[in-house]
Amino acid sequence: MKAIIVLLMVVTSNADRICTGITSSNSPHVVKTATQGEVNVTGVIPLTTTPTKSHFANLKGTKTRGKLCPNCLNCTDLDVALARPMCVGTTPSAKASILHEVRPVTSGCFPIMHDRTKIRQLPNLLRGYENIRLSTQNVINAERAPGGPYRLGTSGSCPNVTSRDGFFATMAWAVPRDNKTATNPLTVEVPYICTKGEDQITVWGFHSDSKTQMKNLYGDSNPQKFTSSANGVTTHYVSQIGGFPNQTEDGGLPQSGRIVVDYMVQKPGKTGTIVYQRGVLLPQKVWCASGRSKVIKGSLPLIGEADCLHEKYGGLNKSKPYYTGEHAKAIGNCPIWVKTPLKLANGTKYRPPAKLLKER
């Protein structure tokens, strides 16, 4: 049997031959790399967002405190901190707190000389604790304190629940009953009465007025000296006599005098002392505070929930791991601030289409 051999001859024509390579569409994405500088890539994932200002919110999964006492209507946080009548109520616990009051912080009842002490800081001090409660008992018997007996002064601008004249529950205005004479400095010890190992915040102060009023109330029109000491911190004051313009608080009667209010922090089991002369505001109910609450500057009301609270932008939900814009304090599950936008390259390095090569 004969084999038939077919010879095939491949002839190359003069037609062009096309060589292909890696191709991709033109890419608008540029990323900066550590080794090659700016590089075009076929795809990127944005890692940053630029927030816009929004309402502050409750922090997701965390109790957030706005006002110290949400149910105390028409009360500033300083009213609550000093336990002004009609401003005493439940102070809920919180892991995060909004510092929402701006200067000047005022309180009713009686004109306060805010700038003489650190009293403006008291609401923020309380806000920094997770749990705060006002004691049910008084820390000392003010009527029988050294230099007494005293009657407890009240203010017509400070009505209580029965619409009678009242005063702050944290202090007793000690006015001598029948011994209206000058006195040398007297000392009262302030015991620790909190029951759960909390910090005890004890509020106290003194009253100053015109010479005539000081003489009528206390039997002494000279400047009076006061000192508080607790937890290794000692503070001294000398009262100012006269020079106060009449001032009205919350539609009450015009007041010719002023009160200076301060506080001291007593650690568990530690006794504080107050050295005083006439016009003292002796401590009564105290704040018992424990735990820590993160504090951030913000505004009320708190609307909805957010992953993060940011001082400049309010409530943020974390849609990207980083953000650009204004850098400020933030708490919660927050994106990280970066100066310029970040991108993650999720494609390949861009290569231009291969050129057509001709062979003759």
From Swiss-Prot:
Keywords: Disulfide bond, Fusion of virus membrane with host endosomal membrane, Fusion of virus membrane with host membrane, Glycoprotein, Hemagglutinin, Host cell membrane, Host membrane, Host-virus interaction, Lipoprotein, Membrane, Palmitate, Signal, Transmembrane, Viral attachment to host cell, Viral envelope protein, Viral penetration into host cytoplasm, Virion, Virus entry into host cell. The lineage of its organism: Viruses, Riboviria, Orthornavirae, Negarnaviricota, Polyploviricotina. It comes from the Viruses. GO terms for cellular component: host cell plasma membrane; membrane; viral envelope; virion membrane. This is Hemagglutinin. It is a single-pass type I membrane protein. It comes from Influenza B virus (strain B/Hong Kong/22/1989). Belongs to the influenza viruses hemagglutinin family. Homotrimer of disulfide-linked HA1-HA2. In natural infection, inactive HA is matured into HA1 and HA2 outside the cell by one or more trypsin-like, arginine-specific endoprotease secreted by the bronchial epithelial cells. One identified protease that may be involved in this process is secreted in lungs by club cells. It is found in: Virion membrane; Host apical cell membrane. The gene is HA. Major glycoprotein, comprises over 80% of the envelope proteins present in virus particle. Gene3D superfamilies: 3.90.209.20, Hemagglutinin Chain A, Domain 2. One of its GO terms (biological process) is symbiont entry into host cell. Binds to sialic acid-containing receptors on the cell surface, bringing about the attachment of the virus particle to the cell. Plays a major role in the determination of host range restriction and virulence. Class I viral fusion protein. Responsible for penetration of the virus into the cell cytoplasm by mediating the fusion of the membrane of the endocytosed virus particle with the endosomal membrane. Low pH in endosomes induce an irreversible conformational change in HA2, releasing the fusion hydrophobic peptide. Several trimers are required to form a competent fusion pore. Glycans are attached at residues 40, 74, 160, 179, 246, 317, 346. One of its GO terms (molecular function) is host cell surface receptor binding. Residues 1-15 form the signal peptide. InterPro entries: Capsid_hemagglutn, Hemagglutn_HA1_a/b_dom_sf, Hemagglutn_influenz_A/B.
